[in-house]
């Protein structure tokens, strides 16, 4: 697959994202909606963008790595959630489940889930948004509880994997910024059903 970049776009490397969400039609990713600020040079105004370019594979992969966090935060995968996540290799239970970190994200427990977006608030919190496809084929929309990425005071009730969640969100932010800058997946062009000669 060939991914493309547009030229002549503003530099989004310094954009401060507040929301990123896949736009989907009939179960297919068709674009990305984002809310962000570009900083002082642009008047520090909140901007929005909705593009109908297909998201690039690196962005989809980065969002896919958030799936275990969505599952754990929403308590959708109880048989794994209390045992830990792939980076907790000191846990014998996890060692028996996971060969490598990459294998962890493709575990069958996560196959029916999709992270479609996330949003930050002005107090340093984040909310993950996603879906679970039920055995009936229907879709259950999931919104994870808000988590403070850098709590000022620890209460013991924080999500246990905040460091990894923050790292993965930064990777997603980078990929969304590249998308805003023009990087996208291959465009799907519908072929004509009839040749021009056949229409005559």
How would you name each of these model-derived features?
Residues 1-123:
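OB-fold ssDNA-binding interfaces and closely related basic DNA-contact patches used
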